[in-house]
Amino acid sequence: MTARQPDPRLSPGLAAWLDDHAGALDDGSHDAAEVLPRLAAAGVFRLGVPAAHGGAPGTDIGDAIEAVSQVAEHSVAAAFVAWGQRVFIEYLLRSPNAALSQAWLAPLLAGEVAGATALSNAMKFLSGIESLQIGARQDGAHWVLDGRMPWVTNLRKQGFLVAAAVSAPDGTPAVVALPHDIEGLTRSADLDLLALQSSNTAALDVRGVRIDPQWLIHPDARQYLPQARPAFAGLQCGLSIGLARRALRAAGEAGQGQASRGILGEPLQALARQLDEATARLVDGVRSERFVAEPWLLFESRIALAEIASQAVQLELQASGGAAYLKPAGDGFARRWREAAFLPIVTPSLVQLKTELAKRRARLAAEGAA
């Protein structure tokens, strides 16, 4: 039993390549530099981008979420790269800095330059969870930046732009873009992750980086990020959707389909329905922009989809039995198990989101009692 499959958008060639290299992309034995051009050549990043900017006509953000989901069915490492790239493109589409968008959208869509989002810190800043990690001081017409970004994905060694939130000289939180070769920006070695190793994930040190207004994505993150957050989190949810679909399909096929006909049949069908319903709610909320005014509904969707993915992998294990624990037969399951472990901790983590929802419930209860 599997969740409903939408009209296919992922090219057969890309799907086959991802299947062939999923294990190597997870453990880092395949060159991470190849992922971005492969995704770009298949048109993954053009979905949901206006045709006037080089996008695929007749598509919207829901199609972009679906594209990330379908990549994640084959490789969450590749989907993580797709998420970072497509979110950065979304930042430029929403930026009032038209010159910045015009200069960089084409190479980003073509996969010639990587786009990295380091705005997780800013998302937590908006919720009062932590302070901004990069400060700016005025020096004539320039800002001079200092700070650190401890975990950033899609920092392709061949060239990248990274979006970062900074505390402007007047204290306003702003969003800027930094090119990989700007003086004072230093990329660490790749982080030694448990999984998703071919995702070009590293840390960035920012020491005396001088920028002028041409690199400003938006002057006020408090206005900008609530508008961008639904796309940021919605595309991120594609990781959970795709992984859940693949695990449910594997569970249904285990033992020549015996699991789906036996005691696990009902749980598999129920979870597939939950996945379809949660996916539909997510896409509808992002498309309608309801999540801009009601972000707590977005948080609930993110939590629900990550938990569904975890349950799906558990069902795959139960359906596969001991075969899932043997190499090489269980390699695909083992990778999905590690991928599922990542979903609760990617920022905003489930703990952070549940904390925010608990604060909201407490506030509403206090207001009701007043």
Residue ranges and their predicted role:
Residues G322-A370:
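Glycine-rich phosphate/cofactor-binding loops in nucleotide/flavin-utilizing enzymes
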Residues D205-A233, A247-A259, V283-V286:
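A glycine-rich, basic-preceded beta-loop-alpha segment at the flavin cofactor/substrate interface
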Residues D31-A41, F45-D146, T153:
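Glycine-rich flavin
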Residues D19-D27, Q256, L275-S310, Q314-P328:
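C-terminal helix-coil-helix/basic helical segment that borders enzyme active sites and/or dimer interfaces
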Residues G242, Q269-D276, F299, I303-S310, ...:
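Generic structural signal for well-ordered, non-transmembrane alpha-helical segments
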Residues L235-E294:
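Extended amphipathic alpha-helical segments enriched in small hydrophobics
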